[in-house]
Curated annotation (Swiss-Prot):
Keyword Protein transport: yes
UniProt subcellular location: Cell inner membrane
Subunit-level organization: Interacts with the Sec translocase complex via SecD. Specifically interacts with transmembrane segments of nascent integral membrane proteins during membrane integration.
Protein name stated in the entry: Membrane protein insertase YidC
InterPro entries: Membr_insert_YidC, Membr_insert_YidC_N, YidC/ALB3/OXA1/COX18, YidC/Oxa/ALB_C, YidC_ALB_C, YidC_periplasmic_sf
Gene for this chain: yidC
């Protein structure tokens, strides 16, 4: 009996490990219209003196002290009457997004999606998480990925153009101070352009020499350009050499936010973050763990950080302008962060002008596929293939496409995604009913042979080879194939895996109500009662009904499909009937409702099919 129990436990573990391996094999990881009247750009100048994760303590007066740089050069952010001296915030609103900027660095403090709300809260989804003074969203550093971000105050210019196009620009005079006291001034600028009804915006980054006249200079032994002193600070001889922008082999580095939103729940094991890089029409996934780092030195078309339902994707206008791409997953105090650094090559020209197109929004094909067709987006982009971020990939992708089509079909008939899940499950089970029936017939045949098998085991007890020979002879005489009951299930496995993946990640399920007050969101676990305390060991604070229904349906199905067994098999059958469903109860307790609706519906439909076939078989016997 102990031996049988051990074998049953080992087999159960192998099934779970095998399922996980198969899922990884199949899904490899290397991992409505809006009113134009809402097109408003609101500048909200706010003097800020408090410490915050966004901007830090605002200065009332800008410093002129030179700052040491990893490249060995000294950068100066000079004062002038035209430079801004107070930190202010600016808000851009479109029908789809609400973006808060700071003039410190010209960075983004907050990026909210106005059509999507945070889980169980009436707040917009926040896509900029864990921002801090030394790393905000789209911070710029002069130099490579190790250089500090520019944290000076910028001048601001904002416009609303034709067709509701929003533009907000940030400009700043900077200078490189040389050993002889001379300075090379230049202008650093960032400009964001937002189109209405679009989740993508443009980010223009430029560095340009403020040149007035050209003359020879004996101290430098080269042709230099004289520049206005007001841009470099008082009482300073200003010389700008025409040698471009090179701060330690790089012009600048652009950084995405430390982490994308929405805010992650540590208990949600179904949420994830992953990197993906597109190049040459192909996409590669990078699944970095804590403190992981990956450097990409080849030209890339785009790079992304994505989660279960939302994504941030950056498309550089000139892939060859990038020296490298650095994907980072540093371990922060409470969680692993995920961000990307775009390192721009050094240039020998007196000006740098780059454009990045940034998508921040739903990780869904219906949105991302618009950037494969020029007529469907305002940028004229085509064949970007950024929709690969929303596609699970693997050999089961065609099945997922079919399942999505079925879901949408049933949703048009009955506009409830929970009902659509059940109808798709029923349709799939009906489609595969011939295979289910074949498996049932094989099970019935096994029940008929069970007495003969028991007699063989008793007669040749201790002689394993003889038992195998007699069993094979029995199967031949009865024209029974032991694998005939397994093959129908194996054929259905790809569909089961595809449905599991789809129902766990389908964007349309986010915020979709199935049953009011019980299942208000198919992307979240259900809840029937909130406990005033956390349960010991599990730390559960919510009582859920779907996991209970799933376990009950699984136990009923297991008992109905059991074949007669010997006393020696009793322990292993008990484990398979009761212990495994209980294991899955804990495993799926916090699973999204949509996934459990699918599993429970599949068990229910299969249970009904088994009852019908069993009743039909009993009638035929009589």
């Amino acid at each position: 009996m102990k031996k049988n129990m051990f074998i049953a436990v080992v087999l159960s573990v192998l099934v779970l490990v095998g399922a996980s391996f198969l899922q990884e094999l199949l899904y490899p990881s290397a991992s409505s219209s809006h009113s134009a009247a809402e097109h408003t750009l609101s500048a909200v100048p706010e003097e800020t003196r408090t410490q915050s994760a966004h901007g830090g303590a605002a200065d009332t007066q800008e410093t002129t002290q030179p700052a040491a740089h990893p490249s060995g050069q000294v950068l100066v952010f000079p004062e002038s009457e035209t430079e801004e001296r107070v930190e202010r915030t600016y808000v851009v609103r479109t029908p789809l997004v609400q973006v808060t900027f700071t003039n410190r660095g010209g960075d983004i403090l907050s990026y909210q999606l106005r059509e999507h709300y945070a889980a169980q809260r009436r707040e917009y989804v926040e896509m900029v998480e864990q921002a801090r003074p030394d790393h905000r969203a789209f911070s710029l550093a002069l130099g490579d990925e190790y250089a500090p971000n520019v944290n000076a105050l910028f001048q601001v210019k904002q416009e609303i153009g034709a067709r509701g196009v929003h533009s907000i620009g940030f400009y700043r005079s900077v200078a490189t101070q040389h050993a002889d006291g001379t300075r090379t001034p230049f202008v650093l600028a960032k400009r964001y352009v937002f189109y209405p009804d679009n989740y993508m915006f443009e980010l223009h980054v430029s560095l340009s020499a403020d040149v007035l006249e050209e003359r020879e200079d004996s101290r430098q032994g080269a042709k230099v350009r004289a520049v206005a002193e007001t841009n470099a600070g008082p009482a300073t001889t200003v010389l700008a050499r025409a040698n471009g922008f090179d701060f330690g082999t790089a012009s600048y580095t652009l950084r995405t936010p430390p982490e994308i939103g929405p805010e992650r729940n540590a208990a949600d094991k179904y949420e994830f973050r992953t990197f993906m890089v597109g190049a040459g029409g192909k996409a590669k996934t990078y699944a970095l763990k804590g403190d992981g780092r990956e450097q990409v030195d080849t030209p890339v078309s785009w790079a992304s950080v994505s989660g279960k339902y939302f994504a941030l994707i950056v498309l550089p206008n000139d892939a060859d302008s990038l020296k490298r791409l650095v994907l980072s997953a540093p371990q922060a105090e409470t969680a692993v962060q995920h961000h990307i650094a775009f390192v721009r090559r050094a240039v020998a020209q007196p000006a740098v002008a780059d454009v990045y197109r940034v998508y921040i929004g739903p990780c869904a094909e219906q949105y991302l596929s618009a950037y494969n067709v020029a007529s469907r987006n305002p940028y004229g982009l085509e064949r970007t293939y950024i929709d690969a971020v929303a596609v699970s990939g693997g050999i089961l992708y065609p099945l997922e496409v079919l399942l999505k089509w079925l879901l949408r079909l049933f949703y048009t008939l009955i506009p409830n995604w929970g009902v659509a899940i059940i109808l798709v499950t029923i349709a799939i089970k009906v489609l595969f009913f011939p295979l289910t029936k074949r498996s049932f017939i094989a099970m019935q045949k096994m029940q008929e042979l069970q007495p003969h098998m028991q007699r063989i085991q008793e007669r040749y007890k201790g002689n394993t080879q003889k038992i195998h020979e007699e069993m094979a002879k029995l199967y031949r005489e009865a024209q029974y194939n032991p694998l005939s009951g397994c093959l129908p299930t194996l054929v259905q496995m790809p569909i089961i895996f595809a449905m599991y993946r789809l129902f766990n990640n389908y964007f349309e399920f986010r915020g979709a109500m199935f049953i009011p007050y019980w299942i208000p969101d198919l992307s979240l676990a259900d809840s029937v009662w909130t406990l005033p305390f956390a349960l010991p060991v599990t730390q559960w604070t919510q009582m859920r009904m779907l996991p209970v229904l799933y376990v009950v349906s699984q136990i009923m199905f297991s008992k109905l499909t059991q074949v007669p067994h010997t006393e020696q098999q009793k322990t292993s059958m008990t484990i398979m009937t009761y212990v495994m469903p209980l294991f899955f109860f804990f495993f799926f307790y916090d699973a999204p409702s949509g996934l459990l609706v699918y599993w429970t519906a599949m068990n229910g439909v299969t249970l009904v099919q088994q009852l019908v076939m069993k009743r039909t078989a009993n009638k035929n016997k009589t």
